[in-house]
Amino acid sequence: MVPMDEHVVYVGSKEPIQYVLAVVTEFSSGSDTVTIKARGRAISIACDVAEIVRSRHVKDASYRDVKIATETVQGDRGRHSKVTSIHIVLGKPAAAGA
């Protein structure tokens, strides 16, 4: 069974190229799908990462699924707030003969 967070790249506040390299590394290690996850302000970076991967690095990758949701998170002071999240699933065609 595959661990839950395997083949997942969490996007935060780093430069997009850092996440692009992480996604490309996952594909290079033999994964057929990679999920890019982000919340809040990092959503636009996640979208950029997916497009950079598809257009420049893994040209045969395609969007398998995109999910947008609202999550409730608890802040430092115990207050609950709602944050938008996105999960972008990129996939490559299965290797021939597999």
List where the protein language model places each region.
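Beta-strand cores of modular interaction/reader domains in eukaryotic scaffold and signaling proteins
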Residues: 10, 35-37, 87-89
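Conserved helicase motor "Helicase C" RecA-like lobe of SF1/SF2 P-loop NTPases
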Residues: 41-58
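Short amphipathic alpha-helical molecular recognition features
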Residues: 11-15, 38-41, 45
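Histone-fold modules and their flanking histone-like tails across chromatin and transcription assemblies
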Residues: 1-27
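Short, surface-exposed connector motifs at secondary-structure boundaries
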Residues: 29-35
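Arginine/glycine-rich "motif VI" loop of SF2 helicases in the C-terminal RecA-like domain
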Residues: 29, 56-61
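C-terminal edge-of-domain segments
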Residues: 63-98
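Residues that cap or initiate secondary-structure elements
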Residues: 15-17, 42, 72, 94
